[in-house]
């Protein structure tokens, strides 16, 4: 298992002199619940501090005042029990390049509805732009009807796909080009994972998506136990085995969080953070990590976008998957170092998650 952090930290590019906010991605953070708006704020703050161009926070309407006061740079989109979650999901997923789903979301019925609609919309957009085998469509292939069915539920992904396709009638080549420019990523954390673990049909949707675009999951040991057949004790004894099994079963980049966090993907890449950062053992640190990974992905994407538009479809997908792994490892390393740097100011016992987030940009600059 790889442990050389310099390999990844050297891959952080300088910010392009000709860039604008769109260059560095549009990140949708679907997070927070009533009484837990901090998770949405921390993930959004970390995304901005690690390089993201635009962040939109999708959270209950009751969180508006606090979130907009703490992070006025973020776009706020609120919802409540009367919201049309289908329309809400389609509008926000269409806007975003990167989706962070789950921090502080809760597992109540409203949160489950939001997760279901977001996953169905992402799956539908994947199917419009890609064929049934997860290969980017060509012009000729796009003329044919895609007959593959994704997992069924009350409002299945295929029906969402047909609706979106009829509302956005573009040539398949244009859709393919837009898809490559977006290079979308889905990251699922915290209550997003807890909702999946209790609903196999939603986990099947994630499998469907992961066969088409990179999906990152970031469980801690208890969340991993809920997602897998392994017990908590087995996971603690051999976290790498649990992470490898989840990555292979679902095609994800899997982050097994711990004192020495492990990152594995379905292509066989594996990395272990060689240096613990005890200052991170505080509430909100996982939310910061999710935002950091998303922000780093946006930065790497801006640097590698030209290479991603060259070569065969399979070569493009290989680069795309590798970029997701690189961004995840780099995010883990930056997060750990930011915690250590924050501890120099506030002490190891005294670091708050937002202070770790605030150090991300400084660590990246170094």
Features from the language model and the residues they span:
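Positively charged, low-complexity intrinsically disordered leader regions
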Residues: 1-22
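Glycine-rich phosphate/dinucleotide-binding loop and adjoining beta-alpha-beta core of small-molecule
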Residues: 1-5, 58-275, 310-319, 365
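Short glycine/threonine-rich catalytic loop with a Thr-x-Gly-x-Asp
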Residues: 16-23, 34-36, 277-293, 320, ...
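Substrate-binding N-lobe of the ribokinase-like
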Residues: 20-75, 81-83
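Glycine/charged-rich beta-loop-alpha catalytic/anionic-binding loops adjacent to active sites
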Residues: 21-29, 267-279
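Short glycine/serine/threonine-rich phosphate/pyrophosphate-binding segments
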Residues: 35-50, 56, 108-111, 193-197, ...
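Short, small-residue alpha-helix embedded
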Residues: 226, 282-317, 323, 328-333
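Charged C-terminal helix
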Residues: 336-366
């Amino acid at each position: 298992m790889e442990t050389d952090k310099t390999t990844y930290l050297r891959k952080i590019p300088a910010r392009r002199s000709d860039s604008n906010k769109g260059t560095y991605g549009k990140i949708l953070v679907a997070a927070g619940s009533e009484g837990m708006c901090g998770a949405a704020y921390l993930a959004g703050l970390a995304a901005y501090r690690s390089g993201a161009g635009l962040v939109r926070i999708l959270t209950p309407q009751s969180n508006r005042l606090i979130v907009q006061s703490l992070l006025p740079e973020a776009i706020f989109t609120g919802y409540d029990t009367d919201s049309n979650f289908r329309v809400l999901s389609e509008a926000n997923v269409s806007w975003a390049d990167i989706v962070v789903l789950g921090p502080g979301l809760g597992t109540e019925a409203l949160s489950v509805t939001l997760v279901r609609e977001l996953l169905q919309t992402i799956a539908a957009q994947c199917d419009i732009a890609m064929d049934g085998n997860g290969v980017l469509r060509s012009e000729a292939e796009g003329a044919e009807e895609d007959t593959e069915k994704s997992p069924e539920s009350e409002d299945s992904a295929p029906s969402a796909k047909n609706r979106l396709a009829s509302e956005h009638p573009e040539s398949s080549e244009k859709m393919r080009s837009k898809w490559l420019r977006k290079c979308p990523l889905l990251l699922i954390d915290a209550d997003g994972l807890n909702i999946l673990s209790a609903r196999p049909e939603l986990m099947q949707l994630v499998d469907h998506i992961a066969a088409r675009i990179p999906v990152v999951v970031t469980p801690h040991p208890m969340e991993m136990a809920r997602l897998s057949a392994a017990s908590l004790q087995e996971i603690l004894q051999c976290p790498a085995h649990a992470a490898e099994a989840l990555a292979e079963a679902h095609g994800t980049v899997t982050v097994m969080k711990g004192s020495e966090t492990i990152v594995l993907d379905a292509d066989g890449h594996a990395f272990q953070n060689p240096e613990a950062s005890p200052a991170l053992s505080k509430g909100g640190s996982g939310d910061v990590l999710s935002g950091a990974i998303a922000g780093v992905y946006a930065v790497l994407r801006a640097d590698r976008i030209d290479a991603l538009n060259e070569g065969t479809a399979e070569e493009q997908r290989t680069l795309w998957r590798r970029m997701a792994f690189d961004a995840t490892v780099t995010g883990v390393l930056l997060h750990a170092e930011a915690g250590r740097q924050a501890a120099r100011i506030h002490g190891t016992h005294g670091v708050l998650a937002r202070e770790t987030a605030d150090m991300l940009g400084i660590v990246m600059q170094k």
